[in-house]
Amino acid sequence: MLRFLKPFPLRFGKRFYSKVPPVTNHERILPKQPSFPTAPAQNEIATLTIRNGPIFHGTSFGANRNVSGEAVFTTSPVGYVESLTDPSYKQQILIFTQPLIGNYGVPDCKKRDENGLLRHFESPHIQCAGVVVNDYATKYSHWTAVESLGEWCAREGVAAITGVDTRAIVTFLREQGSSLAKISIGEEYDANDDEAFINPEEVNLVSQVSTREPFFVSGGDGMLNIAVIDCGVKENILRSLVSRGASVTVFPFDYPIQNVASNYDGIFLTNGPGDPTHLTKTVNNLRELMNTYNGPIMGICMGHQLLALSTGAKTIKLKYGNRGHNIPALDIASGNCHITSQNHGYAVDASTLPAEWKATWTNLNDQSNEGIAHVSRPISSVQFHPEARGGPMDTFYLFDNYIKEAIKYQKSRTA
């Protein structure tokens, strides 16, 4: 069971707070997931068709259904469970560059840690629409595994194809850019059927992965209170906060956080899928928040882009995005390079930042922006994922810095 905050009001140090909205939920409330047949469509003929591109034939090992979405690739050698449950991959067709996938199976989706957070998954369900691998491991072995990757995909309604040349697919996407694609199960398919190529980024994908109602996760003594704007939050972001002693209140992406921000020691903006320009209400809320709130604000991934948009800066769509656990990012202030975990198709155009903002991180592969900060206030964000899961832990310290700022702000309010 989740450990949660006591009924309101809350007490922090010498100051008494009682305006936090009464929340009775202790788990995220997500849109209802459709049910699918549980038997995998194994050894069925399957086809990956890239719009205005090549066609690849293989065999299915997932759900017996046709799907479409934006074809993207990840260079992560491990962590397919974490990648597939990352909400930032919502409705995308994910191609793995690692040739062998599925060899350690899938752990129990119901296992939770001492804070009630999912132990092995980044969200309750697979988020991508389809999975593409070169060689699917039909036999798996790991002490935490309870089912195969194919069984999991079938149960979640996710189409999966193996036996295709993923190197050729990635080469095409790298040269031509991310493209719409579809996976068809069975012998009948129409490569020119444009109606089958559905562009998920034409809609607000964040609304499909954000909690419908606020919920609590409590950590440590609960004396530090952080408000999280959920654009598709990964479980390990919440874990990274509560493991540092924070109690976390998670709000829907479009919640008017500016109305309750004074009750919190920090505001946190999470990752999420799709085009950030769809979230005009969230951007307007953040703009108003920064006009009235003096505490620390931190953003990750989508949160980074939304923070930039709220300042008046612009975002751009990358040619094929950055997705993997081995991407170098430069800390401009120190000159140090860190290996980071990333998953995004958009980036902030640093040249459009207002004068009171500065770029703080740069991607060393494509020179895109990886971080911004206000020059005088404790507001900052990064494009990469310091919480990892999977990936390197080089930038874990960014959570420590944020918590230190939240404690500092709390003390200034209770003095």
UniProtKB/Swiss-Prot annotation:
Q: Which Pfam families match?
A: CPSase_sm_chain, GATase
Q: Which PROSITE patterns match?
A: GATASE_TYPE_1
**What highest taxon heads this organism's lineage?**
Eukaryota
Q: Which NCBIfam families match?
A: CPSaseIIsmall, PRK12838.1
The species this protein belongs to is Schizosaccharomyces pombe (strain 972 / ATCC 24843) (Fission yeast)
Q: Where is the Glutamine amidotransferase type-1 domain?
A: 225-412
Please describe the quaternary structure of this protein. Heterodimer composed of 2 chains; the small (or glutamine) chain promotes the hydrolysis of glutamine to ammonia, which is used by the large (or ammonia) chain to synthesize carbamoyl phosphate.
In Swiss-Prot or TrEMBL terms, this protein is called Carbamoyl phosphate synthase arginine-specific small chain
Substrates-to-products reaction catalysed: hydrogencarbonate + L-glutamine + 2 ATP + H2O = carbamoyl phosphate + L-glutamate + 2 ADP + phosphate + 2 H(+)
Quote a single Gene Ontology cellular component term: cytoplasm
Pathway stated in the Swiss-Prot or TrEMBL entry: Amino-acid biosynthesis; L-arginine biosynthesis; carbamoyl phosphate from bicarbonate: step 1/1
List its EC numbers: 6.3.5.5
Q: Which GO terms describe its biological process?
A: 'de novo' pyrimidine nucleobase biosynthetic process; arginine biosynthetic process via ornithine; glutamine metabolic process; L-arginine biosynthetic process; urea cycle
- Where does this protein hold L-glutamine? 88, 272, 274, 302, 305, 343, 345-346
Q: Does the keyword Transmembrane apply?
A: no
Offer an example of a GO molecular function term for this protein.
glutaminase activity
Where it sits in the cell: the answer is: Mitochondrion; Cytoplasm
Q: Where is the transit peptide?
A: 1-17
Q: Tell me the function of this protein.
A: Small subunit of the arginine-specific carbamoyl phosphate synthase (CPSase). CPSase catalyzes the formation of carbamoyl phosphate from the ammonia moiety of glutamine, carbonate, and phosphate donated by ATP, the first step of the arginine biosynthetic pathway. The small subunit (glutamine amidotransferase) binds and cleaves glutamine to supply the large subunit with the substrate ammonia.
